[in-house]
Design a protein with these regions (language model features):
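Canonical Rossmann dinucleotide-binding motif of NAD(H)/NADP(H)-dependent dehydrogenases/reductases
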Residues: 10-42
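Active-site loop of short-chain dehydrogenase/reductase
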Residues: 16, 64, 91-92, 139-153, ...
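The beta1-alpha1 cofactor-binding region of Rossmann-like NAD(H)/NADP(H)-dependent oxidoreductases
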Residues: 49-50, 69-80, 114
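Substrate-binding pocket helix/loop in short-chain dehydrogenase/reductase
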Residues: 106-109, 113-118
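A short, exposed helix-loop element centered on a Lys and neighboring polar residues
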Residues: 132-133, 179
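Catalytic loop of short-chain dehydrogenase/reductase
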Residues: 149-173, 178-179, 183-187, 200-203, ...
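SDR active-site lid
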Residues: 187-271
């Protein structure tokens, strides 16, 4: 697939219809607010009904916003979301598959329990697959230009993070799938394009580190484990400050969301800031692979 083949005309976000999973908090909420600010109609999908209803109420002054409680790991729930979107708007132009969780396992790779894998991959990977298989055929049938944005992470999407092995593995899968999705859109001559989003800019005030609040009872850990307990954002900042000896940078989620939408409008495949350090790490990883050595990981202070 050549670069020319991947190129697609810019998208007009005003008047578009966007769906954002995991949209009631953190990065997802920031994306919803930014989309409304650019004149898009937004359908927020989230598993937390109370947070979803509050977010819809808070953002309603910005434009056409609605919410559908959705469990992204469930095909019926996701199909209900799609039906609600087409019933209300008649189409979906922008699909942000953003819902994500940590494994809750922590510790060493062999200390992760099967349910840690099922929980993390169920949301981060299977949830993306269900979203794509549910929405993309309908979007393709409509024949309209559109974008499918998958939220990955530099923690795994770029390079492994040894102390977060399951989460990083799930995000590596998301990045790999995003590339495959884009190649197939182009080869099929589709009007759709894919993007992979790498959030950046510092620590992020999201619900990721307290995601265990939504963990189903049937996927609970069997043993006590060595995993990190759920923590608030302030507790996360304190943990990183103690590990590094300095106050951590905090990402501006609103500004990040605006930059993401700039990239979506341009039909960029990779949505990220500050790729210089990433490129350097990838070069070192490629060199190590060429020598048959263990590639360097992505080092984070957690």
């Amino acid at each position: 697939v050549t670069a020319d083949a991947v190129d697609a005309p810019p998208l007009e976000l005003a008047g578009s219809v966007a769906v954002v999973t995991g949209g009631a908090s953190g990065i997802g909420r920031a994306l919803c607010a930014a989309l409304l600010g650019r004149g898009a109609a937004v359908v927020i999908a989230d598993v937390e009904l109370t947070a979803l209803e509050a977010t819809v109420a808070e953002l309603s002054a910005l434009g056409d916003v609605s919410g559908v409680r959705t469990d992204v790991t469930d095909e019926v729930s996701t199909a209900t979301l799609a039906d609600a979107v087409w019933a209300r708007h008649g189409r979906c132009d922008l699909l942000f598959l953003n819902a994500g969780v940590t494994s809750g396992g922590g510790g060493l790779p062999w200390q992760q329990e099967p349910n840690d894998w099922r929980w993390c991959f169920g949301v981060n990977v299977v949830g993306v697959g269900i979203g794509v298989s549910t929405f993309v055929p309908r979007m393709l049938a409509d024949g309209r230009p559109g974008q499918v944005v998958l939220t990955s992470s530099r923690d795994g999407g770029i390079a492994p993070v040894p102390q977060a092995s399951v989460y990083a593995a799930s995000k590596a899968a998301v990045s790999c799938f995003a590339e495959s999705l884009q190649h197939n859109f182009v080869r099929e001559g589709a009007a759709l394009r894919a993007s992979v989003f790498y959030p950046s800019g510092g620590l992020m005030d999201t619900g990721l580190y307290s995601a265990a609040r939504n963990r189903p009872a049937e996927l609970a850990r069997v043993g006590e484990g060595t995993g990190r307990a759920s923590m608030t954002f302030e507790e996360l900042k304190a943990r990183v400050a103690a590990a590094t000896g300095r106050e951590p940078a905090v990402a501006d989620l609103a500004a990040m969301a605006e930059r993401v939408l700039d990239g979506v409008a341009r039909r960029d495949f990779i949505l990220a800031d500050g790729l210089d350090g990433t490129a350097e790490l990838l070069h070192r990883r490629a060199d190590a692979v060429g020598r048959g050595e263990l590639p360097p990981p992505h080092v984070v202070a957690l």
